[in-house]
Curated annotation (Swiss-Prot):
Location relative to the cell: Cell membrane; Membrane; Perikaryon; Cytoplasm, Perinuclear region
Disulfide feature: none
Taxonomic classification: Eukaryota, Metazoa, Chordata, Craniata, Vertebrata
GO CC terms in record: endoplasmic reticulum; perikaryon; perinuclear region of cytoplasm; plasma membrane
Biological processes, Gene Ontology terms: angiogenesis; arterial endothelial cell differentiation; BMP signaling pathway; epithelial to mesenchymal transition involved in endocardial cushion formation; in utero embryonic development; Notch signaling pathway; positive regulation of endothelial cell differentiation; positive regulation of phosphatidylinositol 3-kinase/protein kinase B signal transduction
Sites of Phosphoserine modification: 15, 121
Alphabetically ordered keywords of this record: Cell membrane, Cytoplasm, Developmental protein, Differentiation, Endoplasmic reticulum, Membrane, Phosphoprotein, Transmembrane, Transmembrane helix
Transmembrane segments: 56-76, 84-104
Record membrane topology: Multi-pass membrane protein
UniProt name for this protein: Transmembrane protein 100
Superkingdom of this protein's organism: Eukaryota
Length: 134
């Protein structure tokens, strides 16, 4: 290990660093520090985009779907049923459909949770409003 100073990022909580101990060929114990990444650091690094995965997956899914369609069309235009290129095309096609379906499912689940939160906050407002006029 080097004796360089470790630069701390201001404003982030210090997380405990797990230690991995190993023995090398000479019988010496080597200690390796493995830093943990907290949720705050992850949110800062990604710009808060870690909860919007379904929006990031859609462009990749469309590209994979188009690629799968083209490869499958080329493979079947040469009547190469069961060849490697036709299997690759079908795999890409099904992967694109799977990615689109999973992003749509994630979007639907997120919309439901937003509706539930909105409904819950409206219920709280109505209860508070009844208390004012009672």
């Amino acid at each position: 290990m080097t004796d360089e100073p470790i630069k701390e990022i201001l404003g982030t909580p210090k997380s405990p660093k797990p230690v991995a101990m190993e023995k090398n060929a000479n019988g010496e114990v080597v200690v390796t520090l493995v830093p943990l990444v907290s949720e705050i650091q992850l949110a800062a690094a990604t710009g808060g985009a870690e909860l919007s995965c379904y929006r990031c997956v859609i462009p990749f899914a469309v590209v994979v779907l188009i690629t799968g369609t083209v490869v499958t069309a080329v493979a079947y235009s040469f009547n190469s049923h069961g060849s490697i290129i036709s299997i690759l095309g079908l795999v890409l096609l099904s992967l694109g459909l799977f990615l689109l379906a999973s992003s749509a499912l994630c979007w639907k689940v997120r919309q439901r949770s937003k509706k539930a939160k909105r409904r819950e906050s409206q219920t709280t407002l109505v209860v508070n409003q009844r208390g004012w006029f009672a």
